[in-house]
């Protein structure tokens, strides 16, 4: 099985572009690749999914223990001919930017993956070799196995490749030339989402066409035994229903928002909910007039509601449907953008304020910079639908908007010690800015149990 991780010295080097080009080329060759993303990012996996037509998975060593990450990787890679993981940020950049914990290197070390280093030869030549050697020597083993040059002219590649191999001892495997017609646009949370780029498939095809690669060398460096799937670890124990429970009750319908405004979901979270007994019912707060009928729960994930605030506000029937359902006690989870949607109002990118569902007291407003960005540990103050008092869960925040009332149900603490209160929770509700990673936790089981109880009560009336 072909397995490798794509990394770079820093963000903006072209990891996503190279990863998409490699995935598309491997798919053309019939390798049936699957893909992964290190860290908590939602957007890059959307591009992987656009290339492959199947889900991409996040692997995060802050969210999950090493054995859980290995199990998730093995499960998702099973049956595929190639597994390609895209690293996050710089190769060694982990918690708080001052640790290699949860970095791309940490993931490569945990999974034993060879690493292909993406380098952009902008204004440097021999100095690139010095930088690469520094990365090689910084940790042992570095797992660096090969070099890919991005945004590189053919004549420059012919000059740099033999020099880099001589000076670093690494194999230079290929390059992607300058492709202005295939550039992926960005905005405040990173790249625009895959669904917003109308000609994305043409761009992906252009990348794959232009990719120059020594495939024989790549396969020699990256081919190895497929990871073993440890069935006793999949799904993690916290997600397992009681023995025979699946036969005792039918699947519980849970409405999940999915459209341009609500698109930040982890594949592992959705899979964990399904393993816990949920039937996922997709709906669009932008387009649909009401929630799906006869549901037992509601999941409002993050996304970009601030970019669609006017359209969301204009869909009054959906806002009323959500408000009635939550006030009736429908088990509900709302993360980040979903949390803003449940507030009183939301300011859009132009500064105009729009009425929202009105379930929560806060008003969402634009800050213009990242707010409380990064990893944190969430500690519950009291028992609720998802949490038990004193329970801690690793979470992530990534937003340029804030609320006038973030709640006080939890304490969030960053690795650097900074703390703040946040979140709303009761016996049928969770809402807050933190993004939750559900795989390997008790959350899926608790949410589905609450949804099943509510669904049964509704049917009995």
Identify the residue ranges that each predicted region occupies.
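ATP-dependent carboxylate-amine ligase catalytic core
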Residues: 2-111, 119-146, 151-158
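Structural motif
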Residues: 5, 84-86, 116-118, 148, ...
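Beta-strand->loop->alpha-helix junctions that form or flank phosphate-binding loops
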Residues: 37-38, 172-180, 279-287
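C-terminal and late-domain segments of enzyme folds
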Residues: 108, 262-274, 279-281, 366, ...
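A short helix->loop->beta-strand "cap" motif at the edges of active sites that frequently abuts
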Residues: 113, 170, 327-331
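Internal gly/pro-rich beta-alpha loop/helix module
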Residues: 125-246
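Phosphate-binding active sites in nucleotide-utilizing proteins
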Residues: 250-316, 320-327
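Cysteine-nucleophile active-site neighborhood
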Residues: 305-384
């Amino acid at each position: 099985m072909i397995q490798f991780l794509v990394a770079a010295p820093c963000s903006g080097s072209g990891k996503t572009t190279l990863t998409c080009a490699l995935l598309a080329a491997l798919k053309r060759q019939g390798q049936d690749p699957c893909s992964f993303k290190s860290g908590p990012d939602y957007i890059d996996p959307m591009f992987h999914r656009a290339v492959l037509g199947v889900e991409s998975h996040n692997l995060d060593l802050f969210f999950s223990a090493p054995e859980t990450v290995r199990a998730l990787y093995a499960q998702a890679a099973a049956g595929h001919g190639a597994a390609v993981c895209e690293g996050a940020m710089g190769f060694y950049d982990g918690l708080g930017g001052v640790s290699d914990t949860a970095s791309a290197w940490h993931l490569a070390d945990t999974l034993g993956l060879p690493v292909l280093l993406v380098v952009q030869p902008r204004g440097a030549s021999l100095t690139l070799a010095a930088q690469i050697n520094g990365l090689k020597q910084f940790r042992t083993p570095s797992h660096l196995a090969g070099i890919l040059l991005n945004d590189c002219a053919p004549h420059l590649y012919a000059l740099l490749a033999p020099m880099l191999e001589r000076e670093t001892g690494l194999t230079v495997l290929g390059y992607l030339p300058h492709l202005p017609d295939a550039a992926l646009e960005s905005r405040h949370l990173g790249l625009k989402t895959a669904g917003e780029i109308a000609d994305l498939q043409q761009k992906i095809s252009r990348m794959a066409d232009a990719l120059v690669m020594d495939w024989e060398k790549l396969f020699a460096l990256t081919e190895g035994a497929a990871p073993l799937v440890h069935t006793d670890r999949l799904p993690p124990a916290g997600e397992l229903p009681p023995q025979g429970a699946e036969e005792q009750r039918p699947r519980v319908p849970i409405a999940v928002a999915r459209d341009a405004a609500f698109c930040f979901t982890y594949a592992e979270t959705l899979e964990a909910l399904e393993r816990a007994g949920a039937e996922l019912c997709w709906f669009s707060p932008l387009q649909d007039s009401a929630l799906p009928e006869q549901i037992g729960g509601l999941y409002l994930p993050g996304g970009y509601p601030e970019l669609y605030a006017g359209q969301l506000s204009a869909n009054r029937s959906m806002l009323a449907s959500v408000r009635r359902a939550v006030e009736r006690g429908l088990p509900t989870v709302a993360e980040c953008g979903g949390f803003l949607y449940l507030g009183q109002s939301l300011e859009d990118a132009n500064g105009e304020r729009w009425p929202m569902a009105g379930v929560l007291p806060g008003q969402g407003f634009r800050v213009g910079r990242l707010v409380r960005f990064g990893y944190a540990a969430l500690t519950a103050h009291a028992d609720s639908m998802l949490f038990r008092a004193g329970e801690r869960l690793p979470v992530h925040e990534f937003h340029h908007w804030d609320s006038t009332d973030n709640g006080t149900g939890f304490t969030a603490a960053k690795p650097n010690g900074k703390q703040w209160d946040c979140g709303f929770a009761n016996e049928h509700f969770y809402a807050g800015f933190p993004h939750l990673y559900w795989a390997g936790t008790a959350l899926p089981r608790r949410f589905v149990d609450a949804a099943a109880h509510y669904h049964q009560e509704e049917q009995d009336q």
